Amino acid sequence: MAHKRMVREAIVDSGVTAVLRGIDAEDIVSVAEAVHAGGVTAIEVTADATRCTEMIADVDRALADTDAVVGAGTVMDAPAARDVIEAGAEFVLAPNLNENVVEVCNREGVVCIPGVMTPTEADRAMAAGADILKLFPASTVGPGHIGALQGPLGDVPVMPTGGVSTENVAAYFEAGAVAVGAGSALVDYDAIEREDWDAVRDSAAEFVAAVEDARS
């Protein structure tokens, strides 16, 4: 469980998890390396990709000697959780709450971040053993929803994802977020098309700087 604790701390310390979605398997390592070079240490490969387990394993191998932690997102059920963990995922995220996924993660000693929106879902997730709560889609409720959850439930760890940008990330941290998830606001997809890895790095670095400013 010491490794699980370290991974959770890395996610929180990083402040932002890069969501790598819709990226070709041939580009995934280059993108992950560029994002990591930009200062992101928590990297999520979404499990809705056709070759997701291969991609997770490739990224895990490529960043093995760094401070990066590699996880899987969009993990909807227990079989998918088992598959991505076997591929090397150190943390698992989902847009939904499936207690079976939480159970698999706890059994395997892997950080679990299920998706929640309501106090009932948040309470169920924490009771099941979730490590962090993914507020998704955060854009539909905004930063104030974090306080609305923490008011009755106490200081539950919330990670808003969906619509988080450099413009609003400070508001989410001020509201009590422990970290955020970011996709297109952090990952420069146009630069990926051009194979301009320096631009991908710089886009990630800009988001990391916004997170650091928000937390300072």
Describe each PLM feature range:
Residues 153:
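C-terminal binding/interaction regions
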Residues 95-141:
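Histidine/lysine/aspartate-rich catalytic loop segments that bind and position anionic ligands
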Residues 1-87, 195-215:
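Conserved N-terminal beta1-alpha1 strand-loop-helix module at the mouth
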Residues 21-25, 49, 72-78, 93-98, ...:
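Glycine-rich beta-to-alpha transition loops that act as phosphate-gripper elements at the mouths
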Residues 30-31, 77-87, 120-128, 164-180:
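Catalytic cores of alpha/beta
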Residues 92-101, 136-143, 175-198, 206:
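Glycine-rich phosphate-binding active-site loops on the catalytic face of alpha/beta enzymes
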Residues 34-35, 59, 84, 105, ...:
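Generic structural signal for hydrophobic
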Residues 15-17, 42-44, 67-71, 90-91, ...:
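Structural preference for beta-strand elements that scaffold enzyme active sites
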